[in-house]
Amino acid sequence: MNLAVVGYKLTLSYCGSGFHGWQRQGELPTVQRALEEAVAKIWEEPIPVEGAGRTDAGVHAKGQVASFAAPRKLEPEVLKRALNYHLPDTVRVWDARIVPREFSARFDAVSKTYQYLLWNDPVMDPFYLGRAWHIPRAMDVEMMNEAARLFLGKHNFAAFVSNPGMPVKNPVRTVLDCFFLEQGSLVFFNVKADGFLYRMVRNMVGALVKVGLGRLSRQELKKIFENQKRIEAFAAAPPWGLYLLAVDYPPDQES
């Protein structure tokens, strides 16, 4: 019996430490490869799986979204259990649902939210090793929040992209929300936008940490931003503090 092909939408989280990013890279361990291998075991054939965000090596996710089209073989709750059975423990599917087969986790997304974790204390909490960037010197988080407001709205983010040798076709993005929040020694940076350039969030964090440490003024950051050129005034924050927190879709695709 031929089963109708439907779309499947998955929401998943993963610890990025043991992966070379999301995207398949030959035989290297990647999240996409792990997910496609799990799907192939269930359907007994190779099926491509698409991700909303192509996270880099070492970057984590709390709310990555993936999609694929396949014959309707399992109900969503059964599919979720089957995928988690086949996936490594560092990848978990939290939600599975049936959507139109044309649904694209990547191209139908209207915004993404990333979170970056900083541990601001002379002594690093060992439980946050590989999960947060250790900044031993005290930071002025209020000043960092003031500088972060420069990013709000529609701007050219060419100064915050790291893509050696690759021209950026359209460096304009709209940042919808951008702020720091302190909880004890933990400092959270949340940023929501309609899209992100390569390493854009990590470059933003790298620059804002320099502001917080008094090594870069808000005016200097504003000048770098307006010049629209990547310079060596700041280094990108390391990947292990970054999390893909959530992906948003049009209301009719959220059900």
Curated annotation (Swiss-Prot):
InterPro entries: PsdUridine_synth_cat_dom_sf (IPR020103), PsdUridine_synth_TruA (IPR001406), PsdUridine_synth_TruA_a/b_dom (IPR020097), PsdUridine_synth_TruA_C (IPR020095), TruA/RsuA/RluB/E/F_N (IPR020094)
Binding site for substrate: Y114
Reactions accelerated catalytically: uridine(38/39/40) in tRNA = pseudouridine(38/39/40) in tRNA
GO biological process, any: tRNA pseudouridine synthesis
Annotated active site: D56
Pfam families for this protein: PseudoU_synth_1 (PF01416)
Keywords on record: Isomerase, tRNA processing
EC number: 5.4.99.12
A molecular function GO annotation: RNA binding
Subunit record text: Homodimer.
Family indicated by similarity: Belongs to the tRNA pseudouridine synthase TruA family.
Function: Formation of pseudouridine at positions 38, 39 and 40 in the anticodon stem and loop of transfer RNAs.
Protein name in UniProt: tRNA pseudouridine synthase A
